[in-house]
Swiss-Prot record:
Xref: CDD domains: PTP_PTEN (cd14509)
Protein name per Swiss-Prot or TrEMBL: Phosphatidylinositol 3,4,5-trisphosphate 3-phosphatase and protein-tyrosine-phosphatase PTEN2A
EC numbers: 3.1.3.48, 3.1.3.67
Protein keywords: Hydrolase, Lipid metabolism, Phospholipid metabolism, Phosphoprotein, Protein phosphatase
Stretches with biased composition (Basic and acidic residues): 495-507
Induction: Accumulates in response to salt (e.g. NaCl) and osmotic stresses (e.g. mannitol).
Domain of life: Eukaryota
Catalytic activity, as annotated: O-phospho-L-tyrosyl-[protein] + H2O = L-tyrosyl-[protein] + phosphate; a 1,2-diacyl-sn-glycero-3-phospho-(1D-myo-inositol-3,4,5-trisphosphate) + H2O = a 1,2-diacyl-sn-glycero-3-phospho-(1D-myo-inositol-4,5-bisphosphate) + phosphate
Length: 611
């Protein structure tokens, strides 16, 4: 047996079926090369056979695979490689360190990717918002020049080296909600502060002209002065002088000091004040030159200060500098007598509101004699064709004025208005359409249309008739006589007297010499006194007025006649307002007086006809 053992290892792969291989084969292969008889005997023992049987399972696949075909070996080898590789990847016994590292790397990669996407979206959104914001700001700026240097993009212009015009610095909550929202399309407060601190640190002063927007003055280190007045309007004339004096005081302190003037848009109100300042500092000798210079500097198209009333106030300030040495003057007290509309088409019949900086002074919508009438009823045709007149018969005027005042005409085709100053104007002013604010925005054109404003000095409002025995009697005293019927023996003035001066009236005359009304006898009241509507002479007045003036189409010309009862040979009249209240009586009286166009003369007809 020992002689065969050296040949057994070579025959291990060809063990015949049904005969287990000799124990020495396995022992020699597994246990070593011990060929001693003692070693062989130990290998043939039960324990040795048992160990051999156990160890036989391991080489058996290897032995069988050696006899398989090349294709099977290839398939199994590939399968084994696949399963072994899969086992390495899926085995729970694989090292945890590699998985943790892989997971950490994956998480970091995912976080980095999400962060990149988020940052990109945020940056894109910011850029998109900024682009929209820039477009909005440029759209709001319209024709104004912008400051686009040093990384700034502001609605701001250097009018001179020391005078800056800009739009409202918005975007701060101290300006209120709307002021904060306006920061999206107007100058940003932070950007304005950054600009001033960068370019003019410690050398600037801000002038706020807005009455509708304020902000925390501490944002500009307290160097803010406020001279407020409403948008599309004019300031009190004394405010212009005060502004110029304040700005001059700041500029003369240091040659590098600058004034920064703004309203909301930084154009119209700002232009009025800056043009006045240019006049005050004697940059140019005339208001026209100052306005032309400002318009060219501030706007691309040269249309900065365009409202007629604001242009008028720059010229008013020029007069103050020329005639009053820059000193404020008290307002001249006047009475507003009424209005004439020249070349007035039928579609212009406006209601009227008179106001000043303290509030409304007069309005046809609330006055007792006009509040119940439509505008077509209280505008009446004058003897001259194409002229409409408004006044209050029997009253000294519409309202008393002193200084600045505003006339606003409310019309269905669009409102128009103007600001005037009694100290700077004559008692009679004619304004063309180019001198009326907002008239160019009306729907229908009115070529040649003009508004005449008639004033009177407060002491000469109600002139008297020197040829009359009762020249000293006032209209109020005459109106008291209306409570009792007039004596039937009253004499009626001849028609020739009435036709001699059809357009004159003693109440509405500005000059005593122009007063030509009929005189009052000892037994009757004057038939031409506006308040004496109950005298029989009123019948003749209405008759002559009907013959002289075309009043067809006017309601006020037909209704008053119904209240007059006339019999041939009688000089008495039944009261037209019997049994009605004072308001109805006043309205009827207004229509009676309005039927006679002569009561609407202002005593300047000679000059009026020469026009």
């Amino acid at each position: 047996m020992s002689s065969e053992s050296p040949n057994l290892p070579a025959a291990a792969g060809t063990v015949p079926d049904n005969h287990p291989p000799p124990p020495p084969v396995v022992t020699a292969a597994e246990a070593g090369s011990d060929d001693s008889p003692k070693g062989v005997a130990s290998k043939l023992s039960a324990a040795g056979i048992s160990n051999w049987a156990k160890n036989l399972k391991v080489p058996q696949p290897f032995a069988s695979t050696q006899n398989d075909s090349g294709v099977e070996n290839t398939e199994k080898s590939a399968f084994a490689k696949f399963t072994s590789g899969l086992g390495i990847r899926l085995s729970p016994k694989s090292p945890q360190t590699n998985d943790t590292t892989t997971e950490g790397t994956s998480s970091a990669t995912e976080s980095s990717f999400i962060g990149t996407i988020t940052k990109g979206l945020v940056d894109t959104s910011k850029n998109a918002v900024k682009a929209v914001q820039v477009k909005a700001r440029h759209a709001v700026s319209q024709n104004k020049r912008r400051y686009q240097e040093g990384g700034f993009d502001l609605d701001l212009t250097y009018i001179t080296e020391n005078i800056i015009a800009m739009g409202f610095p918005a975007g701060d909550m101290s300006s209120g909600f709307f002021g904060y929202v306006e920061g999206f399309y107007r100058n940003q407060m932070e950007e304005v502060i950054n600009f001033l601190e960068t370019q003019h640190k410690g050398k600037y002063k801000v002038y706020n002209l807005c009455s509708e927007r304020l902000y925390d003055v501490s944002l500009f280190e307290g160097k803010v002065a406020s001279f407020p007045f409403d948008d599309h309007n004019c300031p009190p004339i004394h405010l212009v002088t005060s502004f110029c004096q304040s700005a001059y005081s700041w500029l003369k302190e240091d040659i590098e000091n600058v004034v920064v003037v703004h309203c909301k848009a930084g154009m119209a109100r700002t232009g009025l004040m800056i043009c006045s300042l240019l006049l005050y500092l004697k940059f140019f000798p005339t208001a026209e030159e100052c306005m032309d210079f400002y318009n060219q500097k501030r706007c691309v198209d040269g249309k900065g200060l365009v409202l007629p009333s604001q242009i008028r106030y720059v010229k008013y300030f020029e007069r103050i500098l020329t005639y009053f040495n820059g000193e404020n003057q008290p307002g001249r007290r006047c009475m507003l007598r009424g209005f004439r509309l020249h070349r007035c088409p039928y579609w212009i019949r406006p209601s009227i509101t008179i106001s000043d900086h303290n509030g409304v002074l007069f309005t046809t919508k609330k006055h007792p004699r006009t509040k119940d009438l439509s505008p077509e009823d209280f505008w009446f045709s004058a003897p001259k064709k194409g002229v409409m007149v408004f006044a209050l018969p029997g009253e000294p005027g519409l309202t008393e004025l002193a200084g600045d005042f505003k006339i606003q005409f409310h019309d269905r085709q669009g409102d128009f208005y103007c600001w005037l100053n009694t100290t700077m104007m004559e008692n009679r002013v004619i304004l063309k359409t180019s001198e009326l604010d907002g008239f160019d925005k009306r729907k229908l054109p009115s070529p040649g249309f003009m508004v005449e404003v008639v004033l009177a000095d407060i002491n000469a409002t109600i002139p008297t008739n020197p040829s009359s025995e009762t020249a000293s009697k006032t209209p109020e005293e005459t109106s008291a006589a209306n409570s009792s019927p007039v004596d039937g023996s009253a004499s009626v003035p001849g028609p020739d007297k009435e036709t001699e001066n059809p357009d004159k009236d003693d109440v509405f005359s500005d000059n005593e010499g122009d007063s030509t009304g009929p005189t009052k006898t000892t037994s009757s009241a004057s038939s031409q006194t506006p308040e004496a509507k109950k005298s029989a002479d009123e019948t003749a007045v209405l008759t002559k007025a009907t013959e002289k003036v075309s009043i067809s189409g006017n309601k006020g010309s037909s209704q008053p006649v119904q209240g007059v009862t006339v019999s041939k040979g009688e000089a008495t009249e039944k009261p037209s307002g019997a049994g009605v209240n004072a308001s109805s009586s006043s309205e009827s009286e207004f229509k009676v007086m309005a039927a006679d166009a002569s009561v609407f003369s202002f005593g300047d007809e000679d000059d009026f006809e020469s026009d």
